[in-house]
Amino acid sequence: MIHPIQFTLTNHDGTLLFCVIKNTIFAYKTNGEDGHLDLAGEWVDDYDSAELIKAKVEKEQQRRLAENAAKKLKTNEGEAIERPGNQRRVPLPGKDPKVPVPGPGAPPVYQYIRCLQLSHDEKMLVACTDSDKAAVFFRIELHKDNCLTLFKRQPFPKRPNAVTFADDDAKLLLADKFGDVYAVDSVGEPEKKDPEPILGHVSMLTDIALVTDTKKSYVITADRDEHIKISHYPQSFVIDKWLFGHKEFVSSLCVPEWQSSMLFSAGGDSFIATWDWQKGLLMSSFDYSTIVEPHLTDAHLPPARFLANDGSDRREASISKLLTFKDLPYLVAVPEMTKIVLLLQWDATSGELILSQTLALPLNVVSATVTSANHKLILSLDNREQPGKNFVKIFTLENGKFEEEQAASSSVDEAIVRNLSERPEVQTTVDDIYPLYHVSQLRKRGEHYS
């Protein structure tokens, strides 16, 4: 069976659809006439992580050799001797370092492609890889047989988790799992030394956004510790304000283009928060718990050791993604590991989000993306139970409701099966499917506070 799509991204008019399957990015282009999709490009992350480990081992070997040499003393005859108590075992110079190999029972290592982001002019695509903790940059050149041209690969000290481009696309802002944010040039050669962070949190960063207020730019960052921080940019050492109100982790931030002074945020709490980030005010919160509760399963239960054992049902819901359209006052909210998507409408009069529609899907939703030009919502599904079909569902706003474009959905399914059914690198079994749901793992429990 073909592996489910882990991540989707589309350009503003929906003519390009990027799909991540295992460790490969596929770019599909529609001909614009009958909705037929053609494979326009692809890129596979074949980086050998063992080489990265070997390089780190070699670096450590050289450090220990230098440290050992510095600890040597000399006798009266000028001969070097080891200082007592420093007889550490160090590798001999010139000897190949021994690269550690996972032993029996070690968890599998996945070559994740963790996120995708288009530049504002849609001429560049950036992806984050787990294999070497890098951001990889592509030029989108549709006149070529393969439209994805890799031109830069920038490694980072820790795994990237979220990215966004500066307004002029000259810089990429990247948030990592260590709590640091980096700003690197989008063009030019990769920095040979580890880049220096421009700001940081004391917890894993989960999302990042760049906003503008009266010609001043700010970077908004969210973390696993329910914090949302607003910092000046590029003077990011200056903190403008904090937004307090969440009790659990924040997994997704969304600044709507139709009201750039607002910010939506959600994660492990039972609500979606609406902020006036410029004033630092919590405008309202939308409680989605009663809507999502009927769609939760035993997969949403906490680990057995954290159950109350009192017969209570403690299924925990999380929002994995928030999205908005360019000129439509709707918010798309994706509850993780469920078969529904919430469509919320912003009521400017009451200053609140109102449930407009609940989309019911045949399978769990994995990822979501929207087009800004024609109000399309594209969802990828966990189709392990229905291999070969239901890779995506495409919805369009018609008469105030989002309706499925069945022909468009089928066109994507047909293109994937046509191009990938004979490709062994994207084949899998049910037991070997990459983990598709990551957000709920951000929830902190007793073991994280000890």
UniProtKB/Swiss-Prot annotation:
One of its GO terms (molecular function) is enzyme activator activity. One of its GO terms (biological process) is tRNA modification. SUPFAM superfamilies: WD40 repeat-like. Residues 69-82 have a biased composition (Basic and acidic residues). GO terms for cellular component: cytosol; nucleus; tRNA (m7G46) methyltransferase complex; tRNA methyltransferase complex. Pathway: tRNA modification; N(7)-methylguanine-tRNA biosynthesis. Keywords: Nucleus, Repeat, tRNA processing, WD repeat. WD repeats lie at residues 108-147, 200-241, 245-285. It is found in: Nucleus. Residues 69-103 are annotated as: Disordered. Belongs to the WD repeat TRM82 family. Forms a heterodimer with the catalytic subunit TRM8. Required for the formation of N(7)-methylguanine at position 46 (m7G46) in tRNA. In the complex, it is required to stabilize and induce conformational changes of the catalytic subunit. This is tRNA (guanine-N(7)-)-methyltransferase non-catalytic subunit TRM82. The gene is TRM82.
